[in-house]
Swiss-Prot record:
PROSITE patterns: ADP_GLC_PYROPHOSPH_1 (PS00808), ADP_GLC_PYROPHOSPH_2 (PS00809), ADP_GLC_PYROPHOSPH_3 (PS00810). Alpha-D-glucose 1-phosphate binds at Y108, G173, E188, K189, S207. Homotetramer. This is Glucose-1-phosphate adenylyltransferase. Pathway: Glycan biosynthesis; glycogen biosynthesis. It catalyses: alpha-D-glucose 1-phosphate + ATP + H(+) = ADP-alpha-D-glucose + diphosphate. InterPro entries: ADP-Glc_PPase, ADP_Glu_pyroP_CS, GlgC_bac, GlmU/GlgC-like_hexapep, NTP_transferase_dom, Nucleotide-diphossugar_trans, Trimer_LpxA-like_sf. The gene is glgC.
Length: 423
């Protein structure tokens, strides 16, 4: 395959399918009203924006987004923020909600079934390669490099993988590989004896939930899987182990295609599926030199852009000036004479006078009343925090009134605040 074909033409032969129908139950009340990919992240984005931005920046402009659980917020975001692709140039984002296309008795029953139920749509576009993506991880990756690796390998399936510590293997699909990167085993969330990377005893390759298939091979796998009554119709549990058994799976280490690719620096990839992981990944952005660069003009993260006035920091009525350090604030925010450190404020947040806020993630349209003290708190959209409230200092009170993790991060939602006001 010549360089021109490998670098320029392959992406035209591919279509991406972003799986965005999951609830994300480990995020507890954050997903009461929205799917996990629609959860806010990074001061102005939604989680799904990272996978979609990777597609666009990689040249992949034929995209389907598969939705199911509480999809209104996600669909509205995609319609408002991702409608700029040009259909006349064969660019599109197709929204694919569960609609019982092939089975009038079932909605999507698993990740593989979600793709199978849209198999007629995939076939109508005629891609040579199908890129299956999880819509709920935070990372920057050039899919065109992985696509080229897949096409040149001769394998029918390529699985994106990230290097992790062996003690974390219980939370991921773990693959064993040989010296040529052929996947020789695939174990979903092993409790012990996880296969390690050749040459190491304490590192494993975990699946990123990113798969590239030769399209005809994928269709055959899905049509066979759907007839298997023992199958859970899931890529990690059923499809990938089948591909491995047929010796058709190649491992693609994230370090080969991460953005940017820096020798000796571990690439940034986060599964933000728990409150602790979500909080930590958001606060990563408040570091002096964050590992994830959202200011990169060469690999921008796209999102819906609401027209808002600039953020404003002003003294309180007594002339006391606030102190703001290592904090990201989005458009429409107003802060009066308060101390805020290592935090993120999404759009239209109001912080009234005398507050002390540390290591907090504050989502859109939150009002923080006067003289509040907040530490290690995630505040969901639309909360009105009463004046004088203290959260994050008393573990017993926090656990009684809100959701508190074992690591001390406190989740606050509008429903929790309303119930507290009624007591």
């Amino acid at each position: 395959m010549d360089n021109h074909n490998s670098s320029h033409q392959l992406y035209k032969k591919a279509m991406a399918l972003v799986l965005a129908g999951g609830r994300g139950s480990r995020l507890y009340n954050l997903t009461d009203t929205r799917a996990k990919p629609a959860v806010y992240f990074g001061g102005k984005f939604r989680i799904i924006d990272f996978a979609l931005s990777n597609c666009l920046n990689s040249g992949i402009r034929r995209i389907g987004v598969v939705t199911q659980y509480k999809s209104h917020s996600l669909l509205r975001h995609l319609q408002r923020g991702w409608g700029f692709l040009r259909g006349e140039l064969n660019e599109f984002i197709d929204l694919l909600p569960a609609q019982q296309r092939v089975d009038e008795e079932h909605w999507y029953r698993g990740t593989a079934d979600a793709v199978y139920q849209n198999i007629d749509i995939l076939r109508s576009y005629g891609p040579e390669y199908v890129i299956v993506l999880a819509g709920d991880h935070i990372y920057k990756m050039d899919y065109s490099i992985m696509l080229r690796d897949h096409a040149q390998s001769g394998y029918k399936c390529t699985v994106g993988c990230v290097e992790i510590a062996k003690e974390e293997a219980y939370a991921f699909g773990i693959m064993g590989i040989d010296e040529n990167r052929k996947i020789t085993s695939f174990i979903e969330k092993p409790k012990k004896n996880a296969p390690t990377i050749p040459g190491t005893t304490d590192r494993c390759y975990a699946s990123m939930g990113i798969y590239i298939f030769n399209s005809d091979y994928l269709y055959d796998l899905l049509e066979e899987d759907i007839t298997n009554k023992e199958s859970s119709h899931d890529f990690g549990k059923d499809i990938i182990p089948r591909v491995v058994s047929e010796n058709q799976a190649l491992a693609h280490p994230f370090s080969m295609s991460c953005v940017p690719r820096c020798e000796g620096i571990e690439p940034y990839w986060r599964d933000v599926g728990t409150i602790d992981a979500f909080w930590e990944a958001n606060l990563d952005l408040a570091a002096n030199m964050p590992e994830l660069n959202i200011y990169d003009k060469d690999w921008p993260v796209w999102t819906a852009q609401e027209q808002l006035p600039p953020v404003k920091f002003v003294p309180d009525r007594n002339g006391n000036h606030g102190v703001i350090t290592n904090t990201l604030a989005s458009g429409g925010c107003i802060v009066l004479g308060s101390e805020i450190s290592k935090s993120l404020m999404f759009s239209k947040v109001r912080v009234l006078a005398g507050c002390k806020i540390d290591q907090c993630v504050i989502m859109p349209e939150v009002v923080v009343g006067e003289n509040c003290r907040l530490k290690k708190v995630v505040i969901d959209k639309g909360c009105d925090i009463p004046a004088g409230m203290v959260i994050g200092e008393d573990p017993i009170e926090d656990a009684k009134n809100f959701y508190r993790t074992d690591k001390g991060v406190v989740l606050v939602t509008k429903k929790m605040i309303d119930e507290l006001k009624e007591k």
